[in-house]
Amino acid sequence: EMMDLAIERTDHIHARVGSPQAAQVPDPRIGKGLGWTKRFEVWWDRIIEARAAEGRPFLTINPEFGPPPYQAINPHTEEPLADIWEICLWMSNRFRTRWADL
């Protein structure tokens, strides 16, 4: 019910994938991160379908993943575990492919 209300009121998707343990997953392309990505995509699909059904001409989406402290780092080297720019491009391309027919 709460998600239904949120979906009804959403007109922008800030497409960062998080989990109960972190504001963003270390890498949304693999492993548990991909699992969370797929879960978020179900919600995002519902938002996009709802706006399309209303006849809205567009919906804004930004695939933004932040640097540390949002981004997971190697505790020994303090280096990021993934390339944020590559993740954002991957997410953007995934959106374009997923929703190309809308």
List the predicted regions and their residue ranges.
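Histidine-acidic metal/acid-base catalytic patches
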Residues: 1-102
